[in-house]
Amino acid sequence: TPHKRRTVLREYMEAMRSLWTEEEASYDGEFVRFGASWAYPKPVQAHVPLLVGAEAGPKTMQWIAENADGWMTTPRSTDIPEKIAGLNAAWSAAGRPGRPAVHVLIASRPTPEDLAAYQESGVDELIWGVPDADEAVVLGYLDKLAGRVRS
């Protein structure tokens, strides 16, 4: 149900974390339930960071601060710095140490000014997509992209 989707997502995240970290996991939530279960292989990283991709209103930022490790967004708007500031405030209000991870999915080559603005506003990672194509095309694209990023 739409008005319960945050609860559903939180329960799935908690259930997955238990499967990743406990030898024998179980979960009993309103929407997610399972008895004694085992999941192998376990992640190498003890705490798998969970980032939520969502439009960033105040309620969403509060929810992310309370339940996730960070936020993933696309640069469709020019107010990413303000949204990151809102997330940081929610993070502090939730009593979380450090700061949330922020990843931005981009489709075009950013200018040096764009990169500086992302860094200044607290973006940790920029993520480019790759073409849905065969291996040779994807590897060629990555080589071309690597050359652009280095220049």
Give the positions of each predicted feature.
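Active-site-adjacent structural elements that line small-molecule/cofactor binding pockets in enzymes
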Residues: 1-151
